[in-house]
């Protein structure tokens, strides 16, 4: 009798583990469903029947993103149930700033060797993020690639599609001098600046993943794995009743790089640094890394996850509405005339 033939599992790809994984995630995926979803998990493509009668001139808005090296923290702590929320947040927050309602989401999960339990924890987080954002998880790809990743490592990418009526697109073009800038509080680092944060926390300060942070009642893992806040439902609620001229998602590049993305030519943002209290984790990073303020504001969100430009006359009512939506909001500055040769964001 000849030698036993080589199998796919011998090469490092376990089809049975993949099937187990799919069975484990089905209830999570189904919990995100919307009436427009007309397909089930396991098909070749996700089907979504858009009700165009709800819109005068619907425009689809797409976004894609990842979680970056925050995944390294999840692997160090062996906690994988929150990074999926981050994945959804990074995508849906990017499209809601244009006024779009997220409709559906897809994910890409790549790993060297599939652990059904670890993968299911990640997808559970993705499903939770979709529920928070009101969008359906209608598909995804799980890629098991032996030899491509170190043991226990994985990477994530997310993709979302939303819709907005053409005449309700928010692109910052209607921002004018005198508009007030309102900042929405972040939940922490969100999903940006982690390469620098890891260097300071672990290399410079010498903390371990389970150590308690100084002056904190939280561990390093608890703080660094706090999920990115999803602002979708609050922003969409606000847009139904108030005029918002521009919205910036404060991601990589911080306030200094993201606020200018929505400012029309001839406008600049004046932001008052003392208008909100910077969370302690940012103080720890700044002091631990001996960081200049400019570097802080172009690397981290520093406690502000989203910035809205609104007419000055609406500010009080907007703040009341945001408070009712459980958002911590601060008047952080205003839009001013930008003189030639000056920076588009002035921190004072």
Swiss-Prot record:
Pfam families attached to this UniProt entry: AIRS, AIRS_C
Listed pathway(s): Purine metabolism; IMP biosynthesis via de novo pathway; 5-amino-1-(5-phospho-D-ribosyl)imidazole from N(2)-formyl-N(1)-(5-phospho-D-ribosyl)glycinamide: step 2/2
Keywords linked to the UniProt accession: ATP-binding, Cytoplasm, Ligase, Nucleotide-binding, Purine biosynthesis
EC number: 6.3.3.1
GO BP terms in the entry: 'de novo' IMP biosynthetic process; adenine biosynthetic process
Cellular compartments annotated: Cytoplasm
GO molecular function: ATP binding; phosphoribosylamine-glycine ligase activity; phosphoribosylformylglycinamidine cyclo-ligase activity
GO CC, one annotated term: cytosol
Reaction(s) catalysed by this chain's protein: 2-formamido-N(1)-(5-O-phospho-beta-D-ribosyl)acetamidine + ATP = 5-amino-1-(5-phospho-beta-D-ribosyl)imidazole + ADP + phosphate + H(+)
Gene3D superfamilies the UniProt entry points to: PurM-like C-terminal domain (3.90.650.10), PurM-like, N-terminal domain (3.30.1330.10)
InterPro entries: PurM-like_C_dom, PurM-like_C_sf, PurM-like_N, PurM-like_N_sf, PurM_cligase
Disulfide-bond pairs as recorded: none
Family of this protein: Belongs to the AIR synthase family.
HAMAP family in UniProt: AIRS
Protein name: Phosphoribosylformylglycinamidine cyclo-ligase
Species this protein is from: Geobacter metallireducens (strain ATCC 53774 / DSM 7210 / GS-15)
